[in-house]
Design a protein with these regions (language model features):
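Acidic, Ser/Thr- and proline-rich intrinsically disordered linker/docking segments
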Residues: 2-14, 19-64
């Protein structure tokens, strides 16, 4: 399993399992631009840019 590590809006490092990501979009959370990562049953916001998240997911898909 290849995890991608990103920072959530609290500044904590979180592990994202790309295999279960269903949707990614930009949003505003507490006045800050964030990237929302959606999974089957939940979602969370990370501070990395949309482009960074998409590139990481695409890089993972090319390796698998």
């Amino acid at each position: 399993m290849n995890l991608i590590f990103m920072h959530d809006v609290e500044g904590e490092l979180v592990a994202v399992n790309p295999e279960y990501v269903t949707f990614v979009e930009t949003d505003i959370y507490e006045g800050k631009h964030v990237t929302m990562i959606y999974f089957t049953n939940y979602k969370f916001a990370v501070t990395e840019s949309f482009e960074t998240v998409v590139n990481a997911l695409n890089g993972w898909r090319k390796r698998t």
